[in-house]
Amino acid sequence: MNRVLCVVIIVLAVGYGALWLATNHYRDNALTYKAQRDKKARELEQANATITDMQVRQRDVAALDAKYSRELADARAENETLRADVAAGRKRLRINATCSGTVREATGTSGVDNATGPRLADTAERDYFILRERLITMQKQLEGTQKYINEQCR
């Protein structure tokens, strides 16, 4: 009976040891998988936060772009209206100019010709409006870029 009891105790000890090793192995695996899961959950939260931030920034940039595009279109329309008004004679393009010719004294009766005031040539007038439009475009682009840098590149 001693021998049987000794064999049973040894079998139980080996069984207990095997169960302990298996439990320890699966426990280590569970801890490893939990750590991996927690790491992936943090990465997912960070990715979601990044996506949300990017979406907010995209909406802000789209609103900024729409604002400055609208302002640029309004400025161009105003420039075209001014160009049409000058061409139709409703408005005059005033420049600070002086006549470079000298006044000649006539020996006969003095008089004044029916001369018009100084005026830009048609090509110079067209060039003026082209330069004005380009200046407006550059100003609006610069304002938009500065606003973008100040708001988005912080």
UniProtKB/Swiss-Prot annotation:
Keywords: Coiled coil, Cytolysis, Disulfide bond, Host cell inner membrane, Host cell lysis by virus, Host cell membrane, Host membrane, Membrane, Signal-anchor, Transmembrane, Transmembrane helix, Viral release from host cell
Residue spans, topological domain Cytoplasmic: 1-3
Transmembrane segments: 4-24
GO terms classed as biological process: viral release from host cell by cytolysis
Record GO cellular component, one term: host cell plasma membrane
InterPro entries assigned: I-spanin
Pfam families reported in the protein's UniProt record: Phage_lysis
Bilayer disposition of the protein: Single-pass type II membrane protein
Signal peptide extent: none
Coiled coil: 37-92
Cellular compartments annotated: Host cell inner membrane
Predominant subcellular localization, coarse grouping: host cell
Residues exposed to the Periplasmic side: 25-154
Family from the record: Belongs to the Lambdavirus i-spanin family.
Domain notes: The coiled coil region is probably involved in host membrane fusion leading to lysis.
Subunit structure: Homodimer; disulfide-linked. Interacts (via C-terminus) with the spanin outer lipoprotein subunit (via C-terminus). Part of the spanin complex which spans the entire periplasmic space. The spanin complex is composed of one homodimer of the i-spanin linked by intermolecular disulfide bonds involving two Cys residues and one homodimer of the o-spanin covalently linked by an intermolecular disulfide bond involving one Cys.
Function noted in UniProt: Component of the spanin complex that disrupts the host outer membrane and participates in cell lysis during virus exit. The spanin complex conducts the final step in host lysis by disrupting the outer membrane after holin and endolysin have permeabilized the inner membrane and degraded the host peptidoglycans. Host outer membrane disruption is due to local fusion between the inner and outer membrane performed by the spanin complex.
Protein name listed in UniProt: Spanin, inner membrane subunit
Organism: Escherichia phage 933W
